[in-house]
Curated annotation (Swiss-Prot):
The modification Phosphothreonine is found at residue 181. The keyword DNA damage does not apply. The modification Phosphoserine is found at residues 41, 151, 153-154, 202-203. Pfam families: IQ, Neuromodulin, Neuromodulin_N. PROSITE patterns: IQ (PS50096), NEUROMODULIN_1 (PS00412), NEUROMODULIN_2 (PS00413). CDD domains: IQCD (cd23767). It comes from Pongo abelii. Residues 139-150 have a biased composition (Polar residues). This is Neuromodulin. The keyword Lipoprotein applies. Phosphorylated. Phosphorylation of this protein by a protein kinase C is specifically correlated with certain forms of synaptic plasticity. Palmitoylated by ZDHHC3. Palmitoylation is regulated by ARF6 and is essential for plasma membrane association and axonal and dendritic filopodia induction. Deacylated by LYPLA2. GO terms for cellular component: cytoplasm; dendrite; filopodium membrane; growth cone membrane; perikaryon; postsynaptic density. It is a peripheral membrane protein. The gene is GAP43.
Amino acid sequence: MLCCMRRTKQVEKNDDDQKIEQDGIKPEDKAHKAATKIQASFRGHITRKKLKGEKKDDVQAAEVEANKKDEGPVADGVEKKGEGTTTAEAAPATGSKPDEPGKAGETPSEEKKGEGDAATEQAAPQAPASSEEKAGSAETESATKASTDNSPSSEAEDAPAKEEPKQADVPAAVTAAAATTPAAEDAAAKATAQPPTETGESSQAEENIEAVDETKPKESARQDEGKEEEPEADREHA
């Protein structure tokens, strides 16, 4: 029995040894390799994340730099355009006209001198004109202020002047109304007292009556106006 047991154990060991020999790797080595693979994969994952973040930062920095580079040439182009326009405007102003075939060689210099003199003459009157405009504006402002300051006193002076003509008009209207009413009443009385004997007299009486009727509303209107103006004058006096 013991011999059989020993033989079987040896056979099992031999089988394991054969497997190990065939594979060439022990189980411990397999476990160690598996652990190293896991660690390597984890490290690789971390490094990939870092690389992605760095790449994003690099991409953003590259975009910013590209935008700056694009803006730089645009600004330079704008400045160059502005300088080109200024130089182009200055060139025709300062440049002399081409000489005509019939003129002498000294004409360009004379033209330049004439242009310089004209420019100085234009600049000289412009300065006094601007000073005169400033002085005129200051005078107008002072005049407006003085008028605004004096406006209350002028209104106070105008008020009595307005009251006096109103007071003068009221008695005149009253006297005119008093003068017209007796004449109208006399004409009406005469027209009624005389008998209508003839057609001419009757027509005259009718005309007188019509004249009286026309004058009555006018007189009443004048009296009403006089009555309205009297309390206004009293109020103004008060």
